[in-house]
Amino acid sequence: MRTEAQVPALQPPEPGLEGAMGHRTLVLPWVLLTLCVTAGTPEVWVQVRMEATELSSFTIRCGFLGSGSISLVTVSWGGPNGAGGTTLAVLHPERGIRQWAPARQARWETQSSISLILEGSGASSPCANTTFCCKFASFPEGSWEACGSLPPSSDPGLSAPPTPAPILRADLAGILGVSGVLLFGCVYLLHLLRRHKHRPAPRLQPSRTSPQAPRARAWAPSQASQAALHVPYATINTSCRPATLDTAHPHGGPSWWASLPTHAAHRPQGPAAWASTPIPARGSFVSVENGLYAQAGERPPHTGPGLTLFPDPRGPRAMEGPLGVR
């Protein structure tokens, strides 16, 4: 009986789910980077005030609220730069500062703010009614520009610097926005990793064999071992020569085969029993058969000229009685 065991095949994961997970993992870092770059809208503030001096000079202050690096600052009056305005000063972080009259002094206050002093003649100066604009070029936000003018009701020396509340509020908004985006990204990544880790194992396909197949597979090794053990007893007697025994028997086949019980040939014996069973010699078989004939009262056929009669272990009297003396 031949039985074939089918190995259950593993069901491959769904391609759509795996592809979607891969695309999400690749798109997420780019989304986080874009949100971090664009978090917090950049802003430019401009302040114009009149100093209480003999010449009544004007001071222009500009600042940039953003996370990018500033590469160039341009200050103009009469309108935005390139739209009818006149350039007063150009400030570069590495190449230095260039200014034109009536600008008297331009300098960097911080890395994101500058100041410019203009010479004037008080309230009648044309600078009092004009508009000043500051343009910041930054990376990666780009160019941002804002304009401002002197308030009409401002008195010399009473113009106060801008309150830091809007500046601080813009900085906090940018910091909190970036932090929130990073925190959300980390939580989302952990969620994806945990979901991928706890994904259920692939399901096994049910075997198509009959219910008796496992039982047949279980009995197959035992039947093979029993077939190996069912070996005739005569196969281990390699020292016996059937031709010699047939020659010694004048009446046909050897009688010692018939004397053995028939069920011994089908009795399974283990390897240890075979190894411990001694292989009988030719003389021992003849002795056993002679003893059997002696018990039956007949002359043993193995007492020819080529064979030697071994004495019976019961003594000479037992041999002389049935056989007689010739």
Curated annotation (Swiss-Prot):
Subcellular localization: Cell membrane
One cellular component term from this protein's GO annotations in UniProt: plasma membrane
Transmembrane regions listed in the UniProt entry: 26-46, 62-78, 172-192
Result, substituting Y293F: No effect on global phosphorylation
Signal peptide as annotated in the record: none
Highest taxon of the lineage: Eukaryota
Gene Ontology biological process terms, A to Z: negative regulation of T cell receptor signaling pathway
In-chain residues carrying the UniProt-annotated modification Phosphotyrosine: Y233
Tissue: Expressed in some types of immune cells. Expressed at low levels on the surface of freshly isolated T-cells and natural killer (NK) cells, predominantly on CD8+ T-cells (mainly memory/effector, but not naive cells) and on both CD16+ and CD16- NK cells. T-cell expression levels are variable among individuals. Not detected in B-cells, naive or helper T-cells, monocytes, nor neutrophils (at protein level). Not detected in dendritic cells.
Molecular function terms from GO: phosphatase binding; signaling receptor activity
Expression induction: In T-cells, up-regulated by activation induced by treatment with anti-CD3 and anti-CD28 antibodies.
Disordered: region residues: 296-326
Keywords: Cell membrane, Membrane, Phosphoprotein, Receptor, Transmembrane, Transmembrane helix
Keyword Membrane belongs to the record: yes
Keyword RNA-binding part of the UniProt annotation: no
Lipid bilayer topology: Multi-pass membrane protein
Function: Cell surface receptor for NECTIN2. May act as a coinhibitory receptor that suppresses T-cell receptor-mediated signals. Following interaction with NECTIN2, inhibits T-cell proliferation. Competes with CD226 for NECTIN2-binding.
Additional comment: Was named PVRIG for the homology observed between its second exon and the variable immunoglobulin domain of the polio virus receptor (PVR/CD155) and polio virus receptor-like (PVRL) genes.
Assembly and binders: Interacts with NECTIN2, hence competing with CD226.
Protein name (record): Transmembrane protein PVRIG
The organism of origin for this protein: Homo sapiens
Chain's gene name: PVRIG
